[in-house]
Amino acid sequence: MYKNFLLAVFPLLIQSEKDAFSIFDLDFWNYNAGIVMNFGDSYDDFTYMENRMDLNFFKNNFSAWLQYEYSDPPELGFSIKDLRKYRIEYSSGPWSIKYGDIYEVWGRGLVLAQLDDQGIDFDNSSRGYLINYLSDNISVTQMSGETVNAQLGADLRHPEFEFTHNIDATNINFEAYPFSYGLSFLQSNELHQLKPLGVMDTVDINHRLHGAYISWFGSNMDIFIEYMDKQSKSRTFQTNFSGQEIESLTPLKRGSAAYFNSNYYLGNWSLFFEYKRYSFDRLNPVDTDYIINNYGNRIDYQVMPILYREQNHSFLGRAAHQTNANDERGYQVELSGGLSNGFQVVTQFSHLSRNDTWESISPIEWNRKNISGLLPTTNFSALPYLEFYAELNGYLLNNRLQFKTAIGTNEEVTKVNRFFKGLSNTISENWTYTDSIWYGEDWFYLDSQIVSMDTSINQIETMLYQKSKSFTIPIDLTLSLKNGYSVGLGLAYQERYKNNVKKGNAGGFYNYADSTWILNDETNPNHSSNETTSNYPNETPFQINRMFSLSIGKASKWALTLNYDWTNVQEI
C-alpha cells in the first residue's frame, strides 16, 4: 500500500517542473545539513561511537528529510550503518501529504505523541503516510503506518524484545475562539513478543483508543482538559471449512486517562496547576513488569505528562521519579514571578501515588483498595512520591554576573515487599512422647502424640518496604567579560538516602498451612520491632555527591568545560 501511495505522489513532483530531470540536480533544491557526532569510552569497556547526518531539502510545495546514521556500536541499541529516517512532504492549498517516518502530537499525548529520543533509544514514529486537511477553523488528520519498537531485557545495552504496531489514526480539531476542541481515534494491531531471542513466542493484541480534549484561553488564564478511553482485546485466528481465516477478539483490558492543566497570570507572577489520573493496569507493589508479561495496557504511542519537574541538573535528574504511566495519579503546582530587584523566583511542589493501597494477605497474594476521591495518598503501600523545588535567579554587577541557586528535595517509596495489618489466628500444638528405649548411654524416643492445641487471636502488623529521599543544592555563576568572553562556575552538593524499613510484631515468615503470619515472639505477641537499614555498601547511612565545574567560552564561537564529580559511596 505504501509503495502505491509513493508512486501516486511522485509524479506530482515531476509534473510540477518544466524539466522533469532537474529534480535530480542538487542545485535545484534549497537544502541544509546537520551532523551529530558522539564518542565515549570507559575503563569497563563501555565504548560507543554515534554519527548522524540530517539532510533537509525544500523547493516550492515540496520538502524532504533524510537521516543517515553510522553508529558502531551505539550507546544503546544495535549497530546501524544505513539510512535511518526519511520523509517527503507535499502541500497544496488546504491539503498536505507526508510519506515516510511520521511524528505527530495530538492534545497532550494521551492518545498519540511521537518522538525520537536517542538518549534512551526510544523512537515511536510510524513509517507510512499522513493526509491533513486544514481550513480556517477545522483540521482533519488521517495517518496509517507501522512502528517497530525494541525493548531492553536482561541486557541493559542491547534490546531483547520487539513489539510491532500497525496503526490507523484520525484526529479532528475545531477552532472557535476562545475555545479549541479535538477528537482522536487510534487503532493498533500489536505483535507482542514474550520471550527474548530464540524461538519467538508472541501474542496478537488489538488496541482501540478514543480521546477528546478542549482548551479555553482568557485574558489572564487558560485551561486544558483531555480524557481518553482505551480497550484492548487479544486476537486469535482460525480457519473455517472454506479455508477462510476468521479473526476472533477476546476482551483483555480496559483503562482510561484524564489530564487537566491551568495557568493563571497576575502581573509578573504566574500560577501553574496540573492534575493526572492514569489507570490502564493494576499490579501489586512487588510486580513492576508492565511491559513484557503484563500486556494490553498503555502502548508506546501514549507519551503523557509526568507531573514532576524535568530537571536540567545531573544531580537532580539522578534522583527523579520513575513515572508509572499505567497506574498513577497526582498533581503539580508551580508558582513563579519577578521580585522588585529584578530577581526571578520559581517554586514547585508535586505529589504522586498509585490509584490503590495494597495489603499482602500472604507473600504471594495481595488485596487492593481503591483510593477514594481524586487526590493521591501518602500511604506507603501506594508508592507515594513527593517533590519540592525552589529557585532564585537573576543578575548582579550591572548585569554582568548571572546567578542561579536552588534547593530540591524529594521522598519516595520505591517498593513494598510485604504489608499486613489485622487479626490473625495463631495455632500452637503440644506434643508428648509415648514410647522410648534406652540405647547406649541415652534415651531414644520412638513415638509421640499431640495432647492439646491452643488457638489464639493476635493483632498482626508486618511491613517491609524500600524508601528513598534526597536533598540537593546546585549553584551556577556566569560572569560576562569583554569581547564576548565569559567564565562560568558551578557547584553542587547532594545527599541521597536509600533505606529498607522493617516494622511490626511479625517478620517475613508465613505459615501456609494455617494461613497466618508468624509472630517474632509467640510468648510476647505485643513485642514489635522498628528497623531501618541502609541499602548502600558497608552500611553507609547516605550517599554524598559533590560536583565542581568550570567553563570558559566566547559567544557563538567556542566553549570549554571541565567537570569534576565525586561521591563517598557507589550505587549498588
Model-predicted segments: where are they?
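Beta-barrel outer-membrane channel/assembly domains of diderm bacteria
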Residues: 16-113, 120-144, 163-176, 183, ...
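Positively charged n-region of N-terminal signal peptides that target proteins for export
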Residues: 1-4, 341
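Electropositive, surface-exposed helix/loop patches at the edges of structured domains
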Residues: 102, 133, 139, 172, ...
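Sec-dependent N-terminal signal peptides
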Residues: 4-13
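Extended hydrophobic/aromatic-rich secondary-structure runs
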Residues: 1, 73-80, 316-321, 334
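Sequence/structural signature of outer-membrane beta-barrel proteins
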Residues: 34-42, 69-75, 95, 102-117, ...
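Solenoidal tandem-repeat scaffolds enriched in leucines and small polar residues
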Residues: 148, 152-205
